[in-house]
Amino acid sequence: MTDQRPRAESRSLTAPSLIGTNGHFASVGDAAHDPKAYEHGVQVIDEEKQFNPNLSKYLSLENVANAGFNYHLISVFGSQSTGKSTLLNHLFGTQFSVMSDRERRQTTKGIWMSKNKTKHEDPNARMADNILVMDVEGTDGRERGEDQDFERKSALFALATSEVLIVNIWEHQVGLYQGANMGLLKTVFEVNLQLFLKDKNTTHRSLLFFVIRDFMGTTPLKNLEITLLEDLSRIWASLSKPQGLERSTIHDYFDFAFYGLPHKGYKPEEFAAEAKKLGSRFREGRRDRKEQLIGASIESGVFLPEYHRRIPADGFAHYAEGIWDQIVNNKDLDLPTQQELLAQFRCDEILREVLVAFDEAIVPFEEKQAAGVRAGEPTILGGLGPAMRGARTKAVKNFETEASRYHKGVYQRKRTELEGKIDTRLKALFQGQLNAAHKSGVKDFSDAVSNAVKAGQKKGASYDFAEIVKQETQAALERFEKEARATVVEGTAWSNYKQELKLYQKDLGEVSGQLRRDEMRRLATRVERWVKSRLSHSVSLEFNSLGSGRGGSGAPETGDKPAENKIWDRIWNLFVQTVLDAERRFTDRATSLDASVEEVDVGLWRLRRKSWSVLRLKIEEEMMEGNLLLKLRENFEDKFRYDEAGVPRIWRPTDDIEGVYTRARESTLTLIPLLSKFILAENNSPPPLDRWIGHTPSSATAADEEDLTPIGGVDAEDGRSLEEEMTILNDAKRQDLTVRFKKAADGVYVEAKRSAIGGITQVPLYFYGLLLALGWNEIWAVLRNPAYFFLLFVCAVGAYVTYQLNLWGPMLKMADAASKQALEELKKRLREFLEASDTGRQAMAMSANATGRDAGEEFEMSSLNRGGKKAEDEDENDDI
């Protein structure tokens, strides 16, 4: 009856001297959460061929998983009950179960693993680090009988994973076939050839270390070595070898070492000493090129580099599980494929782990950048460059450290995959950072230029736009390059920002061009306003001078009076001169704006057209029917009411009123046809407007022309000729104006005629006879009295002189003005008197209330322009 194995929770943590079946080890099926269960070791494969999924847990607890390639694996073979576990316990300080002295039965079922526990104080005898020992179920046991399936599978598993295979035999079994485990070794040789066929590029070399137990020394160890090697060579020669390996020898695939141990029961002290000495052999060594057998040097280490399977410790559990899965399912064992699968599995795990750390560093920046994009305000992320470089370097380095130990092809492929994933995300961040720097840089550049221009305008237009653009462009490029350089990740092709820099420069050029065009438009507007102000003043003066055909109040203060028939010549010359001044101002300012020749040509062309439109509107305003009729009447009255010296006429019945009236009227009527068309008196033709404006520049765009008023004789699509453009009054308006003027002139004539004959018709003739009859005595009294006579004489002389000098009119006006002033002064004194008394104040208050009730609203008369809107003064001093 088989002993029942206790539960893991109830096992003793310290193994007793005799244990049935490694009950103190963590076996297949035990829970992985209890670290104490792994104190002594772990069952790798149970007797039912089940692999333990918790092997990686044991390696982690023993601090082997992080050792990389710095670990070694030893397997022990031998017949059942030959002391394999005892040998391992003495060599490596393990606690594998050993057979009881009271009964002989199988104690090791399946494959068990434990880590080396032996520590040597002598540095020269120090064993290698992280030695893992696998105790394999013994062969030729009665429990399995003739079933050699597990024997073959365990041998194949041990050979695929182990560096050193310890063969435990007794001295008296040397030379025997079954007793010396030659059948097992034949199986080992066969599976080794099977592995070679699957991976011809790699020779899987292993060390067969024969430990000869109960060595008495009677037969020299060298002779025993020769016997064993001869037997092994015969077995190798008997194997059916694949094509190309017919002449291969056993030494092409295996190295051999031999060591003899005394009898443990009879010579326990010698056994312990030799076991300790043998244990010191399990260290790392180097092969001498002249050595053929490792046993040639007893003191050399057994762990040679070519024995190592080059499986990283953290992937060994997964690799071993894959190997056993293929073995137990009777599949051809393909170690290269298993190594690639392991590399694929581990590299994927490592890749995910490094990406987790990468996400912790990068995701916050990605979220901030995405939030800015959603808000429509891309944000420059501070510290992005160092974070990107640090995260990428750390991720790649960690992956390289952990994954470079695996299959090189898989490692390189997975590293490329990792770099691709990382670079895809970092590139998006890099592009987003450059995009944010681009947009914010363009905005800052535009604001900086605009602010500098405004500051210059406040200082009196003393700014150089081209210099401002140059300085701000340089500053913007430096800021962009600074941000780009700070975000560059060295060693990546995608972090080259030269193309983005060129695009940024292009956009800055477009923005500066747009700002220059905006400034040019503002300049053009200021110049046009300046032209309008100057023309409004000058043209108004010219039309006001139409009434200066006499020497009165309408005449110029100095110089000769202007010729009325040359009014258009004067207006045209003033217009041309004003526009020339404006062109010089425009050209000077445009040059400071770094405008191109084409832009200046278009600006001057627009300025001339706009200026003509301003002049045309001003002329139409002055030539409005009401304004023109008023000017004609003033011109007529100046010529009719004043003489050539500018002295007002006092009409007498003897004056030639009809002649003066006719001459003044006809002279004024000649102005109507003169003013009806813009014709220069110099050549009796319209001004050369088409040549003066010039052809449309080739660089002008549709936007440059859309706000321009068509001009007859210049724009063919307008359909009007130059003569029509210069026509101010058509025939119908001229006739109507003539009729209305004549009526107004007739009224003035009638008024003058009435004033001339008014003094005579008011005094009847009989009044003079009556005055003479009644005042005869007074007349004689004056004539007889010298004083009265002299006073009368002086008055008569004064009246005559006044009449001759035509001073009666001014004297009467002066008398009238004096009387009005005296009346106002009287009213003022009366008001002051009334305000000084209570009765007067009450009377004034009652009068004011009555006036407020009876009086209607008062309206102020305002001057209107030709469009019927209130005319406002133009600013005549625009700063351009």
Curated annotation (Swiss-Prot):
Q: Family assignment? A: Belongs to the TRAFAC class dynamin-like GTPase superfamily. GB1/RHD3 GTPase family. RHD3 subfamily.
Q: What residue stretches are annotated with the GB1/RHD3-type G domain? A: 68-307
Q: What is this protein called?
A: Protein sey1
Q: What is its main location?
A: endoplasmic reticulum
State the encoding gene: sey1
What is its EC class?
hydrolase
Q: What does this gene product do?
A: Cooperates with the reticulon proteins and tubule-shaping DP1 family proteins to generate and maintain the structure of the tubular endoplasmic reticulum network. Has GTPase activity, which is required for its function in ER organization.
A Pfam family hit: Sey1_3HB
Positions in the Cytoplasmic compartment: 1-762, 808-880
Organism equals: Talaromyces stipitatus (strain ATCC 10500 / CBS 375.48 / QM 6759 / NRRL 1006)
The residue ranges for the Lumenal side of the membrane come to: 784-786
